[in-house]
Amino acid sequence: MRRVVTLVSKEQAEVGHRFRVVEVPDECRTCRLYPVCMGRLTPGRAYKIVEVRPYMGQRCKITDGEMVPVVVEEAPMIGLVPLNKALEGVVVTFEGECAGCEGCPQQVQVGEKIKIVRVLGRAKCRGGDFAIVEFYALGPPSPSKSGGATASRDPSRAPPSRPLSK
């Protein structure tokens, strides 16, 4: 689905190799390569290498190993969604209906758009019926639809107050 160019170690740089980003080490965030390396990947998501590009001399700040540019594709995730949302090819908003059981999507935030790729089966979670689906996360949650109710108000922009009449 979503493809990005990133860097991986020379040992990982094989077409078809799959890996999961568990978390980004603090040392990576201060590295000059971070924006084109770990900065392009999302913790909790799995990736598959689809193209290996020529080595350009980059070295990892942590391991001092050779880093090779590759094109990765985000691998689909598996999780539970309500049966009424489980249609192949449909884009839905993840609302966290399933929470707390083994099949619940841990890598997706409430409000995030997901695309259902395939329906794999059925399961129960907290007494509800859910579908086991393979899906892609399409991006971060959209801004609050409450019209800014969660935003703090600037008192200098409030309408002028009027004294109460007696």
UniProtKB/Swiss-Prot annotation:
InterPro entries, per the entry: UPF0179
Pro residues bias (residue ranges): 157-166
Region (Disordered): 140-166
Family: Belongs to the UPF0179 family.
Matching PANTHER family: UPF0179 PROTEIN MJ1627 (PTHR40699:SF1)
HAMAP family in the cross-refs: UPF0179
Protein name: UPF0179 protein Tneu_1978
Organism of origin: Pyrobaculum neutrophilum (strain DSM 2338 / JCM 9278 / NBRC 100436 / V24Sta) (Thermoproteus neutrophilus)
